[in-house]
Regions:
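Short amphipathic alpha-helices in soluble, non-transmembrane regions
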Residues: 41-48, 162-168
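Helix N-cap motif at beta-to-alpha junctions
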Residues: 33-38, 154-158, 255-256
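Bacterial peptidoglycan biogenesis and beta-lactam-recognition machinery
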Residues: 36-38, 47-54
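Amphipathic alpha-helical interaction elements
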Residues: 19, 32, 107-111, 170, ...
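Non-catalytic beta-strand/loop surface segments
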Residues: 1-25, 50-97, 108-159, 181, ...
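Acidic/histidine-enriched alpha-helical segments
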Residues: 36, 55-69, 123, 139-140, ...
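C-terminal regions of mature proteins
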Residues: 28-33, 98, 180-256
Length: 256
């Protein structure tokens, strides 16, 4: 369907979109470094000052996430040496929800990096996957998001990989995370966040992202404090509230 829609786009459609959507009024520009605000503004308006002033109305998302349901799909792709697996479900909240950070931390502990549970067990201990992880997606600009697990497996051990992955999800859901895990991942997330701003490009990108999401400049300093403030009970409660291991949807693709 997406391929068909892209194929129908004409050159005139692009010109029309640019004319209707591009202009001053809604544009946001960020810069970081040895920059004079006065000189910067002067150069910007010299470059695009003749653009018309347009306030682009971004439609509010009103459609809510569907209720989670158990299901599976197999997509057969010939001559593939590996198979890809996605498991997930909607969470029904966006990034501004009060439970977002707690749930994000819980899912990061499950599969957010190389030292997370899924990589340590399904990959390193059991040797069943080339790579596996979990994350929250689709939560920006008021959208109800979802959480998912992804993994890459040899087709002949995909079934074992699925079983091992679900075993870790059940353990994570039923037993929760530990204080040591939470402390370690808080350090990782806050550290990565700070490192991402160690260049002028990274700092400008963060400032622009915050502006696009309607956040104040102070959020640059607030984010690590928010992460640090999340308690163990908040994370484990969020996992119980927004995850249902009995209603996961699974899609696998490959030579199966």
């Amino acid at each position: 369907e997406s391929i068909d829609l892209v194929g129908k786009v004409k050159k005139e459609d692009l010109f029309t979109f640019h004319k209707e959507q591009y202009g001053l009024g809604s544009i946001k520009i960020a810069a970081a470094g040895d920059v004079s605000p006065a000189d910067f503004n002067s150069q910007i308006f010299e470059a695009i000052g003749d653009w018309s002033i347009k306030e682009v109305e971004i439609p509010k998302l009103t459609e809510k996430a569907r209720e989670p349901k158990e299901g599976s799909e197999i997509i057969k792709v010939q001559d593939k040496t590996s198979s890809d697996l996605y498991i997930g479900q909607p969470i029904g909240i966006d990034r501004e929800h009060e439970d977002y950070y707690a749930l994000m931390l819980g899912i990061y502990i499950l599969g957010g990096n190389f030292s997370a549970r899924l990589m340590q067990t399904v990959r390193d201990k059991q040797g069943l996957t080339y790579g596996i992880g979990s994350s929250i997606s689709g939560v920006s600009f008021g959208a109800d998001g979802y959480w998912n697990i992804w993994g890459t497996f040899s087709p002949d051990i995909l079934k074992k990989g699925i079983e091992a992955t679900k075993e870790q999800v059940d353990l994570w859901f039923n037993k929760g995370i530990t204080e040591d895990e939470l402390s370690a991942k808080k350090t990782t997330i806050s550290g990565s966040y700070k490192v991402s701003m160690d260049s002028t490009a990274g700092l400008a990108a963060k400032i622009l992202s915050n502006a696009e999401h309607g956040r104040e400049l102070s959020y640059l300093d607030e984010y690590p404090k928010i992460i640090e403030s999340i308690s163990l009970s908040e994370v484990n409660s969020a996992i119980k509230k927004y995850v249902n291991p009995n209603k996961l949807y699974m899609v696998a693709a490959g030579t199966l």
